[in-house]
Amino acid sequence: MAKQSAIEQDGAIIEALSNAMFRVELENGHIVIAHISGKMRMHYIKLLPGDKVKLEMSPYDLSKARITYRY
């Protein structure tokens, strides 16, 4: 069976949590917990509350996401 593709959404960081996790509010108002992608960690891209970001979400668990880009 083929793997489901990730859902991409935009959001804004509300709060920085421990272990490079963030609370992010999506454009539709939902709040999710997100972690930084490996490439962003590798290039030392810093994120602060208020930053606009692009997220990838699994269709299986819509409460967690991966931050893939900072605008």
UniProtKB/Swiss-Prot annotation:
> Might you report a single GO cellular component term?
cytosol
Under Gene3D superfamilies, the record lists:
Nucleic acid-binding proteins
Question: Per the record's keyword annotation, is rRNA-binding included, yes or no?
Answer: yes
S1-like domain sequence ranges: 1-71
Main localization category:
cytoplasm
List, alphabetically, the InterPro entries matched: NA-bd_OB-fold (IPR012340), RNA-binding_domain_S1_IF1 (IPR006196), TIF_IF1 (IPR004368)
Q: Which PROSITE patterns match?
A: S1_IF1_TYPE (PS50832)
List the subcellular locations.
Answer: Cytoplasm
Could you tell me one molecular function GO term of this UniProt entry? Answer: ribosome binding
Q: Does Protein biosynthesis show up as a keyword for this record?
A: yes
Which keywords does the record carry?
A: Cytoplasm, Initiation factor, Protein biosynthesis, RNA-binding, rRNA-binding
* UniProt xrefs under HAMAP family: IF_1
Q: Give the protein's function.
A: One of the essential components for the initiation of protein synthesis. Stabilizes the binding of IF-2 and IF-3 on the 30S subunit to which N-formylmethionyl-tRNA(fMet) subsequently binds. Helps modulate mRNA selection, yielding the 30S pre-initiation complex (PIC). Upon addition of the 50S ribosomal subunit IF-1, IF-2 and IF-3 are released leaving the mature 70S translation initiation complex.
PANTHER family assigned to the protein according to its UniProt record, in alphabetical order? TRANSLATION INITIATION FACTOR IF-1, CHLOROPLASTIC
Subunit structure, as described in the record: Component of the 30S ribosomal translation pre-initiation complex which assembles on the 30S ribosome in the order IF-2 and IF-3, IF-1 and N-formylmethionyl-tRNA(fMet); mRNA recruitment can occur at any time during PIC assembly.
Q: Which family does it belong to?
A: Belongs to the IF-1 family.
Name of the protein: Translation initiation factor IF-1
Q: Which organism is it from?
A: Flavobacterium psychrophilum (strain ATCC 49511 / DSM 21280 / CIP 103535 / JIP02/86)
